[in-house]
Amino acid sequence: MSEKSRSDTSATASLSDSSKSPSSYSTPGTTTQKIIFPDGKLTKCLAFSAFVITLASFQFGYHIGCVNAPGGLITEWIIGSHKDLFDKELSRENADLAWSVAVSVFAVGGMIGGLSSGWLADKVGRRGALFYNNLLALAAAALMGLAKSVGAYPMVILGRLIIGLNCGFSSALVPMFLTEISPNNLRGMLGSLHQLLVTIAILVSQIFGLPHLLGTGDRWPLIFAFTVVPAVLQLALLMLCPESPKYTMAVRGQRNEAESALKKLRDTEDVSTEIEAMQEEATAAGVQEKPKMGDMFKGALLWPMSIAIMMMLAQQLSGINVAMFYSTVIFRGAGLTGNEPFYATIGMGAVNVIMTLISVWLVDHPKFGRRSLLLAGLTGMFVSTLLLVGALTIQNSGGDKWASYSAIGFVLLFVISFATGPGAIPWFFVSEIFDSSARGNANSIAVMVNWAANLLVGLTFLPINNLMQQYSFFIFSGFLAFFIFYTWKFVPETKGKSIEQIQAEFEKRK
């Protein structure tokens, strides 16, 4: 028998044998056994792998922002396309509805992709799942990029659904993959890169949409065609990245391959301490069957799953996508004219990138933790919404120019607060509180909830805003007040802690 075969057989046997002894797991996906993973450094291979993995995050952010600027142009094109396709006139109202469907179906695809991501990640691996996910991106790029040439607007709608599937997969896969390849002391920093690339991509898409770049009647298809670039780049580079060693050990039972991948990521031959910790976690996870979707809401998994869902709801029900999607409308309401709202929106995107970059550093800083940054961010957003309502009320009643400028400042404060913690932390927080056996399903459920809340806010905000005007932001104030209390009362600190230590915190906070 070869050395490789003996190693893999040994790892698999240890998983099998462990089921014959008393379990250190009371429920699948949880452990009472203390497993400590060592700290490490940012190596060239780890940095390269993180860059390649987060190209999928860029795709996610790009398609959040790329529909804003060309919306009016595409609506006009839909009217002409409908006439050519069906030889019938389409009213402006129905053209607006068709474009709204194209925008909203992105979130529907995201929900489906997010819910399916755990199955795909466990079936073909984290790296394999990203590979197949890029095929969806290429199909979507072809549909949306060629729609104008073909003259068929349903291609845009179908393309948005497919790219939504792609982004749903990546919004679960990327944080999970980053968390699994990171050393203990860099989990937060590398996990935050997902949100950083999302914010960078939103900014890039906003810049591309400017009228003197791609935001014209002839060039808007190029905005969607750009989807090909990160997809092809990731496809070309993925094979140079090691597979997740935790996945390879826990799901495939291949210790030899896991050790080889870990040596590349850590740039050292001595990975014995970390590989033994992975073996212990894999052995513990193998004691009982891998938890199914329904098991995630039972026993010891119920409490962490509930908190993971609440963290995703806190992110979306904070109103951040209202600030992002309708920022131009908000800035016009605050008194900006001409092209000023568009440039203000780009400025807001730049602030979001800068603050997210700072949060990447803060999240693993000795003086801060996940919980403290979440509380600080949610509190800042709560205060910002109250102040924004006050400024808009004064401005709408004929107040001085200072009220308009104050409203803009409060929107920026809102975005800064979001980037401090609620923007990045929920994405990798889910992977920190579950072991390898439950991580895929936990991410699937949490990401599906995130996308569902995204869709809910997107569909309901404009009707509510038409009814309540600036006072509609009080709804988000209420949500934020609740999530501040919930985070303070129930959410544990996870920085630098093992799964066992985190689960002990869960028990304290029940």
Curated annotation (Swiss-Prot):
PROSITE patterns, per the entry: MFS, SUGAR_TRANSPORT_2
Membrane topology, from the record: Multi-pass membrane protein
GO BP: D-glucose transmembrane transport; monosaccharide transmembrane transport
Keywords: Cell membrane, Membrane, Sugar transport, Transmembrane, Transmembrane helix, Transport
Keyword Cell membrane: yes
Source organism, top-level taxon: Eukaryota
GO molecular function ontology, one term from the record: hexose transmembrane transporter activity
UniProt-listed SUPFAM superfamilies: MFS general substrate transporter (SSF103473)
Binding site for D-glucose: 195, 315-316, 321, 352, 427
UniProt cross-references to InterPro entries, sorted A to Z: GLUT (IPR045263), MFS_dom (IPR020846), MFS_sugar_transport-like (IPR005828), MFS_trans_sf (IPR036259), Sugar/inositol_transpt (IPR003663), Sugar_transporter_CS (IPR005829)
Phenotypic effect of disruption: RNAi-mediated knockdown of the protein causes reduced 2-deoxy-D-glucose uptake, glucose oxidation and glucose conversion to triglyceride; simultaneous knockout of daf-2 or age-1 causes further reductions. The lifespan in low glucose environment is extended by 20-25% after knockdown, with 7% extension in daf-2 mutant background and no significant extension in age-1 mutant background. Fat accumulation in intestinal cells is increased. Brood size and dauer formation are not affected.
Tissue expression from the record: Isoform a is expressed in pharyngeal muscle and intestinal cells in both embryos and adults (at protein level).
Main location: membrane
Parts of the chain on the Extracellular side: 68-100, 147-160, 217-219, 321-341, 395-409, 465-470
Function text: Facilitative glucose transporter that plays a role in glucose metabolism and regulation of longevity. May also play a role in lipid metabolism. Glucose transport activity of isoform a is competitively inhibited by mannose, galactose and fructose, suggesting ability to transport also other hexose sugars.
Family statement: Belongs to the major facilitator superfamily. Sugar transporter (TC 2.A.1.1) family. Glucose transporter subfamily.
Protein name (Swiss-Prot/TrEMBL): Facilitated glucose transporter protein 1
Source organism of this protein record: Caenorhabditis elegans
